[in-house]
């Protein structure tokens, strides 16, 4: 006889739109390799937008497939804008090693990329997710 325990989770999801950058396969010394992307998310007024950068582990299957499809496009000169859903956002500190901020502490925002709702390449529609039925 087995006991079935229901584990409960608290989900913290962040939705927005931003540009894809630095797509790479990461192979840690210990652990499982994973796909990584940096999202430069837009915030503020449309005529003076600011950017917040999220370093993301691409977790959702649909997001993994789409990010891999867009890798060469992002590495080229094209701009890829996406509507995204992130989960498990947290901050991590680091020390700048070069440049004007060398020796100073910085903060990196990290999250899991769960889903891409839509994507545009240089302003042209590339992908739109189908709604869950």
Regions found by a protein language model. Give the residues of each.
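Single-stranded nucleic acid-binding surfaces, predominantly the OB-fold ssDNA-binding core
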Residues: 1-133
